[in-house]
């Protein structure tokens, strides 16, 4: 067993050993998050086939650091209930993708999962909350906390490591669309919701 695989060692010791074994290309590959997850598979019923685009990216980078948007399903992703990953198949899809990455990484490094979560889990069957501006207008942090916890459970069950959300607070009305990313453009709801 390599030192980086030994759970008895400290994270620092394991990371130092792993980084010492990695090539520059593998290190760059771990920083890579350019591949759209919804483009790496084709679904037929309950079966998934990985695309050549995905396989070539894993080969070229010596692994894959972060995969963005595997569960995303909307018109932009061109995925729906028949072609996308429904909740019942999410673990199966994740395991197929993760196994491929580990098996095709010289050092067996797993990937991290990243997804959009501006106001809930953007996936088929994912729970959504009101956009942040509307959530701020509830003036009810406990209710929102319950909703955020439910979203967190969904993300965790999908093995999502990084949920991308909007947390900026804008005051200028000229920002238009961007103001919906914050809990409010006013200080009181921002203070209430932290």
Model-derived segments and spans:
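Glycoside hydrolase catalytic-domain context in secreted enzymes
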Residues: 1-194
């Amino acid at each position: 067993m390599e030192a980086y695989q030994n759970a008895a060692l400290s994270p620092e010791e394991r990371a130092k050993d792993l980084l010492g074994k990695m090539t520059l290309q593998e290190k760059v590959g771990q920083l890579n998050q350019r591949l759209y997850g919804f483009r790496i598979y084709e679904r037929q019923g309950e079966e998934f086939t990985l695309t050549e685009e995905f396989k070539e990216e894993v080969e070229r980078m010596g692994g894959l650091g972060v995969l963005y948007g595997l569960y995303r399903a909307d018109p932009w992703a061109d995925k729906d209930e028949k072609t996308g990953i429904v909740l019942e198949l999410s673990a199966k899809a994740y395991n197929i993708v993760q196994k491929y990455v580990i098996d095709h990484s010289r050092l067996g490094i797993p990937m991290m999962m990243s997804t959009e979560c501006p106001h809930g889990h953007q996936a088929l069957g994912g729970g959504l909350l009101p956009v942040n501006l509307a959530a701020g207008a509830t003036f009810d942090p406990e209710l929102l906390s319950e909703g955020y916890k439910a979203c967190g459970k969904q993300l965790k069950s999908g093995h999502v490591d990084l949920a991308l959300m909007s947390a900026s607070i804008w005051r200028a009305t000229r920002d238009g669309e961007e103001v919906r990313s914050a809990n409010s453009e006013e200080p009181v709801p921002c203070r209430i919701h932290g």
